[in-house]
């Protein structure tokens, strides 16, 4: 693949980053509205119609399945495009740039998982959900961050974005390694063949997007049938899209596709996913239910594990001289961003559905834990950033 050398951000690239944050932030606010609407509908007289619609079968799969395996492949494709762009020519282009978000992302995945495991140890039916609190929802987090305006320096927003992208990369690897069902070898070979064709297109210097997208659609089908989660086709396709000239959208297939996908993902795909997956009936939720191992492990993994893991490892890296605070920021702001990373919504709900297939009661417990952990993480992050923002 084409590997441009790290560079100083051009005005075009800076404009692209500003559009990126604007779309993510606005998309995060719409996602909040979609999640709230799902909760209201799921606890209203429309609840039966809501759940019936999600379970309606179209072309052999339920609507919910189409959303989680189909639409979310587009979300994961965008994640893959962001990872590749940042790794080759962006905020993660060198090891020094990767150090702070890298250490932070590692802590933000390991500590929440350990907290979940601590609450679910010895429970084979629930221990498989250990990865649920290990993910950060970049759209939600940036949406909340946008409410604080100029109290938060751009460097912190870039840090949060880089951290979340590495977090997403970790989540993709977790899904591939730990949440893959029984494999169909013929379909897996067909998927690998599709990836080989995509790599060949890249090596041959093909810049037209249509051949990549057509082969990518085949790859999605083969992965769906292979037992590997179909959304990973989006990541594989994205990593094969050529970057070209990273400072010119017109000559960069990757930037062009990323620019086209952003509004669709931010304003359609993710809100639809949120509306389809956040709906949970609260009728049977009691205090006793809230302290069950799954919701407690998920909620505390997000609320406590994220902020402790991210802040502790980031501070360790800074104190050891391996990284430095983002420009114009302070320790309080870094802690506030660490707290915001406890907003796990989209990826946490997604992993929850993979962890407990055929166990709707456990999936509902995951939803409650994710909602509680995410809401309190958002509130804590806002309070801390408002307190320390004037010094940013």
Curated annotation (Swiss-Prot):
GO terms for cellular component: plasma membrane. It is a multi-pass membrane protein. It is found in: Cell inner membrane. The chain crosses the membrane at residues 20-40, 63-83, 99-119, 127-147, 158-178, 181-201, 209-229, 265-285, 298-318, 336-356, 365-385. Keywords: Antiport, Cell inner membrane, Cell membrane, Ion transport, Membrane, Sodium, Sodium transport, Transmembrane, Transmembrane helix, Transport. It catalyses: Na(+)(in) + 2 H(+)(out) = Na(+)(out) + 2 H(+)(in). One of its GO terms (molecular function) is sodium:proton antiporter activity. Na(+)/H(+) antiporter that extrudes sodium in exchange for external protons. This is Na(+)/H(+) antiporter NhaA 1.
């Amino acid at each position: 693949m084409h590997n441009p050398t790290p560079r100083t951000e051009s005005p075009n690239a800076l404009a692209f980053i500003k559009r990126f944050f604007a779309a993510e932030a606005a998309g995060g606010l719409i996602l909040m509205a979609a999640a709230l609407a799902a909760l209201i509908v799921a606890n209203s007289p429309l609840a039966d119609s809501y759940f019936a619609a999600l379970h309606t079968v179209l072309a052999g799969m339920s609507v919910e399945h189409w959303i989680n395996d189909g639409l979310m492949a587009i979300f994961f494709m965008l994640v893959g495009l962001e990872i590749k762009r940042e790794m080759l020519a962006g905020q993660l282009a060198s090891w020094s740039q990767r150090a702070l978000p890298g250490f932070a992302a590692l802590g933000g995945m390991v500590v929440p998982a350990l907290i979940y495991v601590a609450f679910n140890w010895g429970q084979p039916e629930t221990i498989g959900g250990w990865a649920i609190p290990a993910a950060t929802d970049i759209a939600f987090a940036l949406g909340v961050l946008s409410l604080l305006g100029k109290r938060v320096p751009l460097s912190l927003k870039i840090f949060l974005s880089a951290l979340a992208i590495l977090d997403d990369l970790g989540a993709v690897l977790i899904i591939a390694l730990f949440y893959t069902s029984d494999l169909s070898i013929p379909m897996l070979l067909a998927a690998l063949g599709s990836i080989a064709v995509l790599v060949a297109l890249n090596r041959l210097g093909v810049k037209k997007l249509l051949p990549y997208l057509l082969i990518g659609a085949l790859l999605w089908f083969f992965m769906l049938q292979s037992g590997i989660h179909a959304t990973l086709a989006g990541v594989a396709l994205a990593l094969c899209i050529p970057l070209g000239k990273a400072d010119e959208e017109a000559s960069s297939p990757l930037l062009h596709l990323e620019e086209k996908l952003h509004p669709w993902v931010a304003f359609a795909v993710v809100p639809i996913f949120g509306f389809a997956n956040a709906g949970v009936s609260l009728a049977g939720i009691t205090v006793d239910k809230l302290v069950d191992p799954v919701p407690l492990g998920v909620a505390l993994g997000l609320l406590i594990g994220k902020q402790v893991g991210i802040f502790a490892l980031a501070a360790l890296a800074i104190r050891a001289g391996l990284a430095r605070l983002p420009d114009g920021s302070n320790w309080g702001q870094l802690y506030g961003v660490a707290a915001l990373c406890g907003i796990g919504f989209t990826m946490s709900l997604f992993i929850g559905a993979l962890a407990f297939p055929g166990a709707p009661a456990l999936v509902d417990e995951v939803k409650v834990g994710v909602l509680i952990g995410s809401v309190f993480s958002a509130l804590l992050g806002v309070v801390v950033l408002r307190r320390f923002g004037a010094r940013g």
